[in-house]
Design a protein with these regions (language model features):
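Electropositive, gly/pro-rich neighborhoods at or near active sites that engage anionic ligands
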Residues: 2-152
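Short Gly/Pro-enriched loop/turn and capping motifs at secondary-structure junctions
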Residues: 6, 219-221
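N-terminal active-site beta-alpha-beta segment that forms phosphate/nucleotide-binding
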Residues: 90, 94, 135-188
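Redox- and metal-dependent alpha/beta enzyme cores, enriched for Fe-S-associated oxidoreductases
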Residues: 167-217, 224
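Active-site/ligand-binding-proximal alpha/beta "capping" segment
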Residues: 226-228
Length: 228
């Protein structure tokens, strides 16, 4: 994966959105934006977006004087979707293909990404989830995934966003039912970045009671293997 030039405005706007969420003053936002631009001008765009922008979020945190600008958002979506966990499980139990239904919910949960959208509501998330769970997957590798899990001994499940990890938890429960032989670990970010999940988030929703949860040791908004 490489970083395309079209990614750059998005990265800058994400920093500005984070600053405005915390009601930072205009001079702070302007100075922060200048430093982000300087940082990006020195980077190799052949690297992946998570690797490229790791330093950007360090700049954002420095100017906003916080290590977790999206902390309130993360807590909100973890809490609200955890309240609906039993309803989502019922949807799965009532479906003809429980594995695929749980997978669809986990895919749909990826909409909770403040690195892509600056405004996301619970209503928007629930509407998207119900749309996706009733549609066919455009690229459907669910059978291939099922067969691979059947033949595997271990699974490293890479977590992504808060709120979304509630659906990951539900999907992992389904995987454990289908493949009790499988040894599963769930990986989260090494420190807070955007609304990505950390150890605290995984523990909050009880994922650690289901499978071992580990940190990837890095603060990029993704999994950059060479830095983990």
């Amino acid at each position: 994966m490489k970083t395309y030039i079209e990614c750059i405005p998005c990265i800058i706007n994400n920093g500005i959105a984070a600053a405005k969420r915390l009601k930072a003053k205009d001079p702070v936002i302007e100075n922060m934006t200048r430093e982000i631009l300087v940082h990006l001008s020195k980077k190799d765009y052949n690297t992946s977006p998570p690797a490229l922008v790791k330093g950007v979020y360090e700049i954002i945190n420095q100017y906003l004087e916080t290590q977790d600008p999206y902390g309130d958002v993360k807590n909100y979506f973890n809490s609200e979707l955890l309240k609906l966990e039993d309803e989502f499980k019922k949807l799965i139990e009532e479906s003809e293909n429980t594995f695929q239904k749980a997978l669809k919910l986990a895919i749909a949960g990826n909409i909770i990404d403040f690195g892509i959208k600056s405004e996301i509501s619970k209503k928007m998330v629930l509407r998207h989830i119900h749309e996706v769970e009733n549609k066919n997957l455009e690229i459907d590798d669910s059978t291939k995934l099922y067969d691979n899990l059947k033949e595997s001994k271990t699974l490293l499940y890479l977590g992504d966003n808060c709120g979304e990890i509630v659906f990951d938890k539900i999907f992992i429960e389904e995987i454990k039912k289908e493949f009790p032989h499988l040894s599963i670990k769930f990986a989260v970010r090494g420190k807070a970045v955007i609304n990505d999940a950390t150890l605290d988030d995984a523990y909050y929703i009880g994922l650690n009671e289901l499978v071992p949860v580990i940190s990837n040791g890095d603060g990029a908004p993704g999994t950059v293997i060479e830095d983990c």
